[in-house]
């Protein structure tokens, strides 16, 4: 491969890493990210945790950087994302025969919305794309000069990649067909005992990464009785058998057409119209020049697209990432057509595509900048305020995304917090309350834990609000704001487990406008203006939209960046408010509010009916039972 391709790869990798580092989430997040951040700091990696390669790299990164686990794992994603973009340069250059075209295609992918958002948080997708691109590159290089050394390199990297994500199996049909088509001695030569043995050894080595997870089963409180049971439990957990059957290839028929609309929205969110058009042209060019490579890219795209399209999960957009990669790769050969117009046409076309990518990066930069996002930490810190294991225990039942954040916060940030899950202690909750009261410890409950306890035990437990946690009403966010203060309120259809309090929303909008405001009924809505006057913008839609306006000479853009029918999980938020090119508000489902100054700096923010809404807390006790407590009771060791 020419040196210029390696130089271009290094340049793009460094530029991408710099971009991701600048917009990096500084710490804790909810959802799977919170789980990864927790597990990487834990001593055991169980089969349920899976991802042995990802966690091995993450643990090494935590040890090398000496950073808190959350920040270190976020940073590892940025580095992996940069490396992935470098690999994309090399693979695209191999497909197109042009380092410039490869670099331009990689830049287009580097600034695509979803990949950028996944490269600034602790997630497996940046490393996944790096390994997909590396596997493809090695396979293409083998086809240039078939030899056992290059074939071993391909087999080894492809097998290694399964330690990060099992969806690498989606590449197997395309890779297999290409190997058979490109084998210089015919397809039968790929089944020679030597090659089969090499492939089997590489596969075994890749599978051996999971020995780490398997071994952890014997270190748990309930170890398996033998290797047979261990393997059954291992397979059940690693492959997520308990929910796989309800999600894979299980999109309801009524939503199939909606998924098509969602995909078109998602594809344009990544590349605009230019990307898909170039990919279509590039695929035609590839088929004409080397039909085997055209078949390879088509099969790789089709398998990953079909899986994501049929995957009934709340964050299907991230599973389209590999298919987006192949769209970007296919765009590179399209640029080489420009040589028919001008002998320097490829370079000119590459520069134009790079400029296009730069314009998209400039436009999306404020919205994708999470460097100032501390919302998850703030939510958990407020929920656990005043708690420590000497004087209190928290019994929680939370949305799973928030609970993952609590797991990290209570194990790494504030390990002195003692907590447990309500489902784990429900059968003996009164005894738990009594025993902790006997040693001077309060028992605090989250809201859903309170509901569960009241339903199970009724008058046997006395439950009252914890005065240490004050949950403001939504309308309180508008109190005492000076007249003329800029604001934006967004209202998105909430998740099914969270209800929208329309009366509270009406009070907020009325307090901001100084008069009643008609409430929205559509899935997406936004209100913007200045306090004391009716909203300058009151827009609602059944489809995602973008609204640009000026509020008191401040340029504001309201972006709805989600497809609510499919999206129940959006780590980057479901939309954004950008004011004066500053990330003023991350929009979530339910109600999101920000008041801000002329420079776009938020003066006050509030959330309701979503996972970032303030969480109430309660204290539970046994009625008419007073626990004698000595003066030293609070200093006794926790029970």
What does each model-found stretch correspond to?
Residues 6-7, 11, 88-111, 149-153, ...:
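Transmembrane-helix signature of polytopic, membrane-embedded enzymes
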Residues 10, 75-96, 134-138, 281, ...:
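Transmembrane-helix motifs of polytopic, lipid-linked glycan transferases
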Residues 52, 56, 65-86, 118, ...:
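Loop-to-helix entry region of an early transmembrane alpha helix in multi-pass inner-membrane enzymes
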Residues 93-99, 119, 135-154, 158-161, ...:
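Membrane-interface transmembrane helices that cradle and orient dolichyl/undecaprenyl
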Residues 143-144, 171-203, 414:
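Perimembrane helix-loop-helix junctions
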Residues 268-291:
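Hydrophobic, aromatic-rich transmembrane alpha-helices
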Residues 273, 296-298, 306-339:
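Hydrophobic/aromatic-rich transmembrane helices and adjacent perimembrane loops
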Residues 287-291, 333-362:
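Signature aromatic-anchored transmembrane alpha helix within multi-pass, membrane-resident enzymes
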């Amino acid at each position: 491969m020419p040196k210029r391709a390696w130089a271009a790869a290094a340049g793009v990798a460094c530029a991408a890493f710099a971009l991701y580092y600048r917009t990096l989430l500084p710490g804790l997040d909810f959802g799977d990210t919170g789980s990864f951040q927790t597990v990487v700091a834990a001593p055991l990696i169980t089969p349920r945790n899976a991802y042995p390669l990802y966690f091995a790299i993450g643990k090494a990164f935590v040890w090398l950087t000496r950073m808190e686990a959350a920040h270190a794992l976020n940073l590892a994603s940025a580095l992996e994302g940069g490396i992935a973009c470098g690999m994309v340069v090399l693979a695209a250059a191999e497909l197109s025969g042009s380092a410039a075209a490869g670099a331009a295609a990689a830049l287009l992918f580097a600034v695509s919305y979803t990949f950028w958002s996944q490269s600034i948080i602790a997630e497996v997708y940046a490393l996944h794309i790096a390994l997909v691109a590396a596997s493809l590159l090695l396979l293409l290089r083998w086809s240039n000069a078939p030899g056992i050394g290059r074939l071993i390199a391909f087999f080894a990297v492809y097998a290694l990649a399964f330690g990060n994500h099992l969806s690498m199996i989606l590449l197997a049909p395309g890779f297999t067909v290409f190997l058979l088509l490109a084998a210089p001695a015919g397809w039968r030569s790929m089944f020679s005992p030597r090659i089969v043995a090499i492939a089997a050894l590489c596969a075994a080595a890749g599978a051996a990464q999971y020995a780490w997870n398997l071994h952890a089963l014997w270190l748990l409180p309930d170890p398996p009785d033998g290797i047979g049971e261990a393997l059954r439990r291992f397979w059940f957990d690693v492959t997520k058998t308990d929910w796989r059957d309800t999600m894979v290839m299980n999109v309801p028929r009524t939503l199939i057409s909606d998924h098509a609309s969602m995909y078109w929205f998602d594809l344009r969110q990544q590349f605009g119209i230019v990307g898909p058009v170039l990919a279509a042209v590039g695929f035609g060019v590839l088929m004409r020049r080397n039909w085997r490579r055209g078949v390879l890219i088509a099969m790789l795209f089709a398998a990953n697209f079909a899986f994501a399209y049929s995957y009934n999960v709340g964050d299907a957009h991230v599973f389209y990432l590999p298919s987006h990669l192949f769209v970007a790769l296919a765009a590179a050969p399209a640029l080489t057509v420009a040589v028919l117009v001008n002998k320097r046409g490829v370079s000119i076309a590459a520069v134009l595509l790079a400029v296009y990518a730069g314009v998209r990066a400039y436009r999306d930069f404020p919205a994708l900048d999470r460097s100032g996002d501390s919302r998850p930490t703030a939510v958990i810190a407020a929920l656990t305020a005043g708690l420590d294991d000497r004087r209190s225990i928290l019994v929680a039942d939370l949305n799973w995304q928030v609970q993952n954040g609590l797991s990290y916060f209570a194990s790494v940030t504030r390990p002195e917090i003692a907590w447990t899950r309500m489902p784990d202690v429900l059968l003996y909750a009164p005894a738990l309350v009594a025993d902790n009261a006997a040693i001077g410890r309060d028992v605090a409950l989250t809201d859903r834990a309170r509901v569960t306890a009241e339903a199970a035990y009724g008058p046997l437990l006395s439950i009252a609000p914890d005065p240490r946690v004050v949950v403001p009403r939504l309308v309180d966010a508008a109190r005492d704001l000076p007249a003329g203060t800029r604001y934006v309120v967004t209202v998105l259809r909430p998740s099914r487990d969270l209800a929208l309090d329309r009366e509270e929303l009406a009070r907020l909008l009325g307090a901001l406008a100084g008069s009643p405001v008609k409430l929205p009924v559509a899935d997406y809505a936004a209100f913007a203006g200045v306090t004391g006057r009716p909203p300058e913008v009151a827009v609602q839609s059944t489809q995602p939209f973008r609204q640009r306006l000026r509020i008191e000479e401040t340029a504001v853009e309201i972006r709805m960046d989600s497809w609510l029918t499919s999206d129940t999980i959006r780590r980057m938020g479901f939309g954004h408010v950008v004011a004066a090119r500053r990330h003023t508000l991350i929009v979530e489902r339910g109600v999101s509010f920000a008041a801000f100054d002329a420079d776009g700096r938020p003066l006050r923010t509030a959330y309701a009916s979503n996972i970032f809404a303030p969480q109430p807390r309660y204290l539970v006790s046994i009625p008419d039972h007073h626990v004698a407590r000595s003066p030293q009771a609070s200093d006794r060791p926790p029970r």
